[in-house]
Amino acid sequence: MINGELIVDNFAGGGGASTGIEEATGFSVDIAINHDPKAIAMHKANHPNTKHYCEDVWQVDPVQACNGHPVGLAWFSPDCKHFSKAKGGKPKDKNIRGLAWVACRWAGLVRPRVIMLENVEEFKTWGPLNRGHHPIKTKQGKTFNKFVSQLQDLGYVQGACGSRLRSANHEKEILYGCKM
């Protein structure tokens, strides 16, 4: 906890983001969520003092998970492969592409002071899919803009980190929101 505020890692994986958060803040991640038992087992090994939820992020109730504690930082690393140009021309999965909406759920229910979402740069082109499950080029960015608008409507000031992160030869960007 940072000054009594929880740190939450959604889509926690093996714990890389949690380790980075801990190194940057000097505080341990309090809650980690991931649907994959192997990822949660690795996260538990790397972060034994964290409360772990091995569940779909949509199945975890933010209010219950936080148990009345305020949230200082909510971190989100939703699956990026359905946005990445590295994926190629394969059809996209609407449900996977929609995982980022869980950040708005947390924003609306527990009002984290800071929300950070990490994804590939193509995330900004998030838009509807056609019947063949391919992005509709003329509607690129529409869903992303709705997502950002919803966070703004919830009282968050949105921005993007000035520098891009390079990971496995793919550029990633951090989108952040701070409560006004």
Where are these regions (language model features)?
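S-adenosyl-L-methionine
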Residues: 40-68
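A short, Lys/Arg-enriched amphipathic alpha-helix followed by its capping loop at the start of a domain
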Residues: 20-28, 46
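Class I S-adenosyl-L-methionine
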Residues: 62-73, 80-180
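Extreme N-terminal starter segment of soluble prokaryotic enzymes
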Residues: 2-7
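The conserved SAM/SAH-binding core of class I Rossmann-like methyltransferase domains
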Residues: 33
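Class I SAM-dependent methyltransferase "Motif I" SAM/SAH-binding loop
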Residues: 10-15
